[in-house]
Amino acid sequence: MSSVRTAVRRMKPYVPGKPVEDVQRELGLHDLVKLNQNENPLGPSPRAVAAARAAMAQVHTYPEGTARRLRERLAQMWNLPADWFLIGNGSDEVFRLLAEVYLEPGDRVVVPEPSFAAYRFVAELMGAEVVAVPLAGWTMDLPAMAEAAARGAKLLFLCRPNNPTGTVFAEADLRAALERVPPSTLVVVDEAYREFDETPFDSRALVQDYPNVVIARTFSKIYGMAGFRLGYGVMRPEVLAPLYTARDPFSVNGLAVAAGLAALDDVEHVERTRALTREGKAYLYAAFQRLGLGYVPSEANFVLFDAGRPAAEVFDALLRRGVLVRPCGSFGLPDHLRVTVGTPEQNRRFVEALKAALGEG
């Protein structure tokens, strides 16, 4: 039997949450409020669902390898050439391809901490050295990250809004940091939650002004298409072209592309989701204040809050009451939990369950 690569042996596998059906069966629950994975409670656009159904008639054929129609649609939306766009099986594939193509064993990769685990995962998979830079006041410490990158980093990952904090940094601060980052360092800005963010930030100008900047986005969040696995990267063609060498030509299925095209055209669905999220966050903030709990104001569709006690205990107490959230011990925040903004009824049930859970202590 062949031996496993050293880098893989050292890694801890990512453990996804249990399927809702399994949790319901184990706990005898019939109605579980799922607020643990930052999904859109409104679901996908009805137009996206209809487009996917129509595309079912062609599932016997292979999809077009580069998702040309979706790239062209995104090019119109961004006002950039189509060859600046790479369509992936979720934005995770974009991260993985960047690591596979640009990293050698021992290369340095700078990541924020706490943040999305995929950055560390793809770096460690390639045997890279991960340099984690702690947040400062719940947001990215851009000067410290630029300083770390200046010491020979191949990749620098940023997340805006950050997961799990929901915080953002100013465009001017990022530009100042980019001036200190070597041109040989690829700076990947993960914008999975960008469509929820109401602060000014010109991603298009950044990728135009800095040849080493990559923007990553997903259809999983505001577009409600997590199950389709669809995302994209925006970058200079000279950065993008080598990724096709390592990319599976059929990693993105035709149903996802059809749904993505329709989702981009349903502006009303996006606006309804934004309004629901805005109102839901205000409701949750007020509830946390009444309960005397600290929380981090968020530009995403979730809120990080301090339970004032071990998060695992609160998680279990909420789960017994039919509410599933995300304990943040894996992020290095043992007393914090992250809750997705749901529908008004889901938010109400969460708050009622949280009151009862805190009353147990």
Swiss-Prot record:
Q: Which cofactor does it need?
A: pyridoxal 5'-phosphate
Which pathway does it take part in? Amino-acid biosynthesis; L-histidine biosynthesis; L-histidine from 5-phospho-alpha-D-ribose 1-diphosphate: step 7/9
**Residue numbers carrying N6-(pyridoxal phosphate)lysine:** 221
Q: Where is the signal peptide?
A: none
What catalytic reaction does the record list? L-histidinol phosphate + 2-oxoglutarate = 3-(imidazol-4-yl)-2-oxopropyl phosphate + L-glutamate
> Which residues are listed as membrane-spanning?
none
Molecular function (GO) terms for this protein are: histidinol-phosphate transaminase activity; pyridoxal phosphate binding
Name its GO BP terms in alphabetical order: L-histidine biosynthetic process
Asked if the Swiss-Prot or TrEMBL record annotates the protein with the keyword ATP-binding, the reply is: no
| Keywords from the UniProt entry | Amino-acid biosynthesis, Aminotransferase, Histidine biosynthesis, Pyridoxal phosphate, Transferase
**Annotated EC:** 2.6.1.9
Against NCBIfam families, the record matches this protein to: hisC (TIGR01141)
Q: Which family does it belong to?
A: Belongs to the class-II pyridoxal-phosphate-dependent aminotransferase family. Histidinol-phosphate aminotransferase subfamily.
Assembly: Homodimer.
> Protein name, please?
Histidinol-phosphate aminotransferase
